[in-house]
Amino acid sequence: MEERININVSATNYDQSSGGIRTILTAVVEMVHEENEFRITDSEFAFGWHFYVVSINRLLIQKLADQMGEDFQKLKGKSLEKKFLKWFSQKIQEKNLKAKLAIKEEMESGKYGIF
């Protein structure tokens, strides 16, 4: 079974942010010659924010890291997931998307409170 990394997204505009995220990830898929390696869920709206999850095949992220080489390794973060999250956040900022990202498994751990 494929291993996936789930990223929680919080955004004020679902259509704009999910469209931008889809564009970024489609470019990655094409760059590393993979297919259908990510999924974006529908959003839940609360307190003026849209909350949704982007699920990405870990193999896609590994291939991106391999292709970027040293540039990827220089990104801040200890793990592959953290480095990818940093890279992904930078791409979202470049597109002026108003969205915040967090690795889902970390959000559900005790690090951020009791869930």
Residue ranges and their predicted role:
Residues M1-S17:
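Short glycine-/aliphatic-rich beta-strand segments at the starts of folded cytosolic domains
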Residues N8-T12, T41, S55-N57, A102-K104:
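A structural detector for beta-sheet-dominated domains
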Residues Y14-F38:
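Short amphipathic alpha-helix segments
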Residues R22-A27, Q62-L85:
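Extended Gly/Ser/Thr-rich low-complexity repeat segments
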Residues E30-R39, I92-K100:
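Structural alpha-beta junctions
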Residues E34-L75:
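Short, intrinsically disordered low-complexity segments
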Residues E37-F45, I103-I114:
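Short amphipathic beta-strand and strand-loop transition segments with alternating hydrophobic
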Residues F72-Y112:
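Conserved short beta-strand edge segments in small beta-sheet-based binding/regulatory domains
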